[in-house]
């Protein structure tokens, strides 16, 4: 399968979900790349962290058999399946961010800020969801999300 990835936010920060989906599909032998308007894709993932107040989804895709949209920017929805969630991210999807690892050690937040959906989606208690070894492979920098 040929898989395309669209980072709808595209604001100088890699999309962790897309990197995990890329790793999953590459592990199955699929070809994965950032989506381009030319060519044809079997499947395109559009991932969005922020809502319209920050990132408008003006990306029209007409060159794919199937399009899957996901992420908090599209509202509540299903979580990634565990087999994808616990993949080591495919950092090659974002070569402009070399030698940096990205991931979550915990989920949830006790603060419940009005502008943020995290406490409503993930709970008001912080709980461990991963070990550092799940997303770090010796990179010089680690960014915890």
Located regions from the model:
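A short, structured N-terminal alpha-helical element that caps or precedes a catalytic domain
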Residues: 1-69, 75
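Conserved Radical SAM active-site core
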Residues: 1, 41-43, 61, 101-106, ...
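Short boundary motifs at domain starts and secondary-structure transition points
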Residues: 38, 92-95, 134
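General structural signal for secondary-structure boundaries
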Residues: 55, 90, 128-131
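Arginine residue identity/basic-tract feature
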Residues: 28, 36, 46-48, 69, ...
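Catalytic core of nucleotide-activated saccharide and alditol-phosphate transferases
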Residues: 61-122
């Amino acid at each position: 399968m040929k898989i395309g990835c669209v980072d709808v936010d595209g604001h100088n920060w890699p999309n962790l979900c897309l990197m995990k989906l890329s790793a999953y599909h590459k592990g199955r032998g699929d070809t994965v790349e950032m989506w381009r308007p030319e060519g044809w894709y079997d499947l395109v993932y559009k991932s969005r962290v922020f809502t319209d107040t920050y990132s408008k989804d003006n990306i029209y895709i007409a060159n794919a058999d199937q399009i899957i949209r996901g992420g908090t920017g599209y509202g509540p929805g299903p979580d990634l399946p565990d087999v994808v969630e616990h993949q080591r991210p495919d950092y090659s999807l974002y070569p402009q961010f070399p030698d940096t690892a990205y991931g979550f050690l915990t989920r949830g937040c006790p603060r419940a800020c009005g502008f943020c959906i995290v406490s409503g989606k993930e709970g008001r208690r912080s709980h461990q969801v991963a070990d550092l070894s799940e997303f770090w492979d010796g990179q010089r920098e680690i960014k915890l999300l």
